[in-house]
Amino acid sequence: MTRPIQASLDLQALKQNLSIVRQAAPYARVWSVVKANAYGHGIERIWSALGATDGFALLNLEEAITLRERGWKGPILMLEGFFHAQDLEIYDQHRLTTCVHSNWQLKALQNARLKAPLDIYLKVNSGMNRLGFQPDRVLTVWQQLRAMANVGEMTLMSHFAEAEHPDGISSAMARIEQAAEGLECRRSLANSAATLWHQEAHFDWVRPGIILYGASPSGQWRDIANTGLRPVMTLSSEIIGVQTLKAGERVGYGGRYTARDEQRIGIVAAGYADGYPRHAPTGTPVLVDGVLTMTVGTVSMDMLAVDLTPCPQAGIGTPVELWGKEIKIDDVAAAAGTVGYELMCALALRVPVVTV
């Protein structure tokens, strides 16, 4: 028998989450963001469940080619654009829409020998200060691109640094309005948070990411608990060992947990080499045999310990949900001082994945 840990992906939940996105932004088209191997879910496993989307948005050329080879004929948006001028030949071959965010890309597009024009997303720096042109340069750059034979349809895009907060949206929107002055153009601005909470940012295309996979863009599950969004990934394992501690005995590396009274603990086949956060402290929520309990002690490479006091019936082989339908990944991430995005993307290759 194989080690009992596995991740299961609920494809019906993924479909439902896309439907909820459409309800939230009924007048916009949807770029389903599948970067980082579909946020750790596996782009080849899940893309067909998102087949009702209007387009896919990602970063890696290899993933874009995979979608084409799997039969996706719709739009694909490369969120960081092309990284080398020679990439444009492949973009042309596979009909990819590219972000343009830097001066060197303008020259590369001008000089490229393409069979047909490429659609362009011109990126505005609206305050994130990662990629994009400053608002006062956008009109000039737009006109340069518009004059190029290699450029097809154009859209203005940006990415919000603080879409969870009204002030963050308003300041970014002001910069975008400055950039768009004098332009009649399509826009794509809304990430997951703006899709859910800021209708004024929807415009022509929304770009949901984390909410497709059933986690909160704010990092707090309570913020999306009433939306109908459902977790797609469930990470589960089993108890493979049981220890009965005496009062004063300690658990795990460094002995960071001490039993106050006699206590049973379960040893679970899951650790940081599987993608469970090493920094998850004692008290991180976990479900044992359907009962809410908590981790105790330091997470090891391959194992972690849980308190069996609330579930005395538990023993060898008892199922454990580490995150998923009942234990929300946002709650585990918050306990560990990180975000659900990171936990999804950190799922280790050695963890078997099944779709349901």
From Swiss-Prot:
The modification N6-(pyridoxal phosphate)lysine is found at K35. Substrate binds at R130, M301. Coiled coil: none annotated. Its cofactor is pyridoxal 5'-phosphate. It holds the Pfam family Ala_racemase_N. The active site is at K35 (proton acceptor), Y253 (proton acceptor). Isomerizes L-alanine to D-alanine which is then oxidized to pyruvate by DadA. HAMAP family: Ala_racemase. One of its GO terms (cellular component) is cytosol. It comes from the Bacteria. It catalyses: L-alanine = D-alanine. It comes from Escherichia coli O6:H1 (strain CFT073 / ATCC 700928 / UPEC). Its EC number is 5.1.1.1. One of its GO terms (biological process) is D-alanine biosynthetic process. Belongs to the alanine racemase family. Keywords: Isomerase, Pyridoxal phosphate. GO terms for molecular function: alanine racemase activity; pyridoxal phosphate binding. This is Alanine racemase, catabolic. Gene3D superfamilies: Alanine racemase, Lyase, Ornithine Decarboxylase, Chain A, domain 1.
